[in-house]
């Protein structure tokens, strides 16, 4: 009888260990990635995905729209349509795209983007002295965030005033050195070597939120907030996904490693796009 009990216990322990191993394997392989073939526009610097499709900037500072991706984020698309020269960084919003012009660090936005016209109209000047833009996914661009030339994060208030095509009332959201900012379904996050989350923005990033919460004191170079998912690139190039994100714990609990030698990432819906250090693009199903 004692031997039988020990056998049953050992058998259950083996089953539990096997299930845990399968679960760990499933978590580590819960995504698929496709490395896009190099084309005449390679190498690339930035890529962004959103309701207005996939947009990328190559190392010649040319801005392109990925054909066939407007309103269909799960579609990898095919080929590129040229839009603009002299672009440093791009971020996709809802039927709008924001980008940084390298000449003077000016911020521009492209409006009028639609299924019939996925590259939109003529870019409009939006703001000067900008290093980075994080577009809102709302129709109302007042809730976007930007990093100005002194590396401070600025966002809009609800009382933002419009004058012609310019928006005139930005407010400080973080006054210390900041590298990247993102606003998505999992809230507003920033990298300033360390990684921080703005409390009160989970599920509704278009609010001013509360205090910044330190998530990870490690060194990060990029972050992207999506619907229930946060992806980040460490300074060593490791692409990681934040685990344990819930409504009650929006900053999550840990990390899952995905890819190496990455430099930028952006996520929307069930997919992500990334750029590696060689300038190659990756399409990732989450």
From Swiss-Prot:
Produced by albumen secretory cells. Found in developing eggs. The keyword Ribonucleoprotein does not apply. PV2 is a very high density lipoprotein (VHDL). It contains 3.75% of lipids. The major lipid classes are free sterols and phospholipids and also have significant quantities of energy-providing triacylglycerides and free fatty acids. It is found in: Secreted; Target cell membrane. Glycans are attached at residue 101. Keywords: Disulfide bond, Enterotoxin, Glycoprotein, Hemagglutinin, Lectin, Lipoprotein, Membrane, Neurotoxin, Secreted, Signal, Storage protein, Target cell membrane, Target membrane, Toxin. Residues 1-30 form the signal peptide. GO terms for cellular component: extracellular region; membrane; other organism cell membrane. One of its GO terms (molecular function) is nutrient reservoir activity. Its main location: secreted. Pfam families: Tectonin. It comes from the Eukaryota. The egg defensive protein perivitellin-2 is a pore-forming two-subunit glycoprotein that affects both the nervous and digestive systems of mammals. In addition, it is a source of both structural and energetic molecules during embryonic development. The tachylectin subunit (31 kDa) binds target membranes while the MACPF subunit (67 kDa) disrupts lipid bilayers forming large pores (inner diameter of about 5.6 nm) altering the plasma membrance conductance. Belongs to the tectonin family. Perivitellin-2 is a dimer of heterodimers held together head-to-tail by non-covalent forces. The heterodimer is composed of the tachylectin subunit (31 kDa) and the MACPF subunit (67 kDa) that are disulfide-linked. This is Perivitellin-2 31 kDa subunit.
């Amino acid at each position: 009888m004692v031997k039988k009990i020990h056998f049953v216990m050992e058998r259950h322990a083996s089953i539990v260990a096997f299930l845990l191993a399968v679960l760990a394997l499933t978590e580590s392989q819960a995504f698929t990635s496709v490395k896009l073939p190099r084309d005449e526009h390679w190498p690339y610097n930035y890529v962004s995905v959103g309701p207005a499709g996939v947009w990328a900037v190559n190392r010649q500072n040319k801005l392109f729209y990925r054909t066939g991706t407007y309103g269909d984020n799960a579609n990898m698309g095919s080929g590129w349509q040229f839009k603009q020269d002299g672009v440093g960084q791009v971020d996709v919003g809802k039927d709008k795209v924001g980008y940084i012009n390298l000449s003077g660090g000016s911020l521009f936005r492209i409006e009028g983007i639609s299924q019939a016209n996925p590259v939109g109209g003529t870019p409009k000047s939006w703001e000067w002295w900008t290093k980075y833009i994080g577009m809102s996914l709302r129709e109302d661009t007042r809730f976007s965030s930007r990093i100005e030339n002194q590396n401070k994060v600025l966002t809009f208030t609800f009382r933002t005033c419009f004058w012609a095509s310019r928006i005139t009332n930005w407010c400080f959201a973080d006054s210390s050195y900041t590298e990247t900012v993102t606003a998505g379904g999992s809230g507003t996050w920033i990298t300033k070597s360390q990684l921080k989350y703005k409390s009160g923005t989970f599920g509704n990033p278009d609010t001013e939120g509360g205090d910044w919460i330190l998530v990870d004191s490690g060194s990060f170079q990029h972050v992207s907030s999506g619907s229930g998912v946060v992806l980040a690139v460490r300074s060593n190039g490791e692409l990681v996904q934040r685990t344990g994100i819930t409504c009650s714990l929006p900053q999550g609990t840990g990390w899952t490693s995905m890819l190496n030698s990455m430099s930028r990432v952006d996520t929307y819906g069930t997919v992500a796009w990334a750029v590696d250090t060689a300038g190659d693009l990756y399409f990732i199903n989450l």
